Amino acid sequence: NKAFLCSKGGKIILGKDCMLASDVTIRDNDAHDIINKSGEITNHPQQVIIGDHVWIGMRAIILKNSEIGSDCIIGAGSVVVKKFPENNLMIAGNPAKVVKKDINWIR
């Protein structure tokens, strides 16, 4: 099972040759609008960019306004909440952080 939750006005960009394990969630939104006292929406969708050849581990969650460079690995159960534009990273944890650099992976 994989979930791509994209809102009106949002965008999820998934590069070529990515590999997603089961129960991966990628969201460009918060599921529900949050409004201020004037009734204006304060939590607009923000795009998610995932580069080419990215391996996303089981039960990883990638949230709005996140970016992952090419040739990266996202560890199982990780929660990505920010931008990691550099290539060849191993990213893991909650919240996700860089745990190794200069890596790559093969199927």
PLM features per residue range, with description:
Residues 1-67, 94-95, 101-103:
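Flexible, glycine/small-residue-enriched loop-and-beta-strand segment within the central core
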Residues 55, 73, 90-92:
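Short-chain dehydrogenase/reductase
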Residues 69-72, 86-87:
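Conserved catalytic segment of ABC-fold P-loop ATPases
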Residues 77, 87-88:
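Tight coil/turn sites that cap or link beta-strands
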Residues 89, 96-97:
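A short acidic/histidine/glycine-rich donor-binding loop in glycosyltransferase catalytic cores
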